UniProtKB/Swiss-Prot annotation:
GO terms for molecular function: mRNA binding; rRNA binding; structural constituent of ribosome. GO terms for cellular component: cytosolic small ribosomal subunit. GO terms for biological process: translation. Keywords: Ribonucleoprotein, Ribosomal protein, RNA-binding, rRNA-binding. It comes from Lactococcus lactis subsp. lactis (strain IL1403). Part of the 30S ribosomal subunit. Forms a tight complex with proteins S10 and S14. Residues 38-106 form the KH type-2 domain. This is Small ribosomal subunit protein uS3. PROSITE patterns: KH_TYPE_2, RIBOSOMAL_S3. The keyword Metal-binding does not apply. Disulfide bonds: none annotated. Gene3D superfamilies: 3.30.300.20, Ribosomal protein S3, C-terminal domain (3.30.1140.32).
Amino acid sequence: MGQKVHPIGMRVGVIRDWDAKWYAEKEYSDYLHEDLAIRQLIQTKLADASVSLIETERAINKVIVTLHTAKPGMVIGKSGANVDALRAELNKLTGKQVHINIVEIKKPDLDAHLVGEGIAKQLEARIAFRRAQKQAIQRAMRAGAKGIKTQVSGRLNGADIARAEGYSEGTVPLHTLRADIDYAWEEADTTYGKLGVKVWIYRGEVLPTKKSVKGEK
């Protein structure tokens, strides 16, 4: 059977950047576990804040965390109370000074993670999986997507045999490296067990910037 490579991992270094923008030699494993703990804490505390991407940067005794969210007001809280509480918890967790930057996602319907999260929540609310997928596809295409593909797998409608069923609209060129394809995988906890939700969104082409060479006229 043909297998698909991870669309984001394939494009890192071409049109996508790394989520963790740091490098270490001897402390690499410590920093990696620290990064995982930071991400887990943020995802737990901000489960309802539509956080799509968490980026980390490091300096000496300092960690810079950038949160991409569709609900910045919920992350910041009244007079910054929520973000201050989160910063204090991260400081305690890492033992370092943590800076938090918040970036608003202008079009959440073009973000694969948020679209997948929305479908998963609808499945948990017992909305039909076909309807949930088709509504998400319509919203993404209206928001300006060039193409979108969704797939829900598991015991659909409580069937004894698990299967996968998906829908697509437009084009999703997975082999084109310059194609800006966002991909996400989510889980929905239903009464019949877990359902997997996959979303691919094609947002158009991105041409890699040509790096100028010194002395080039």
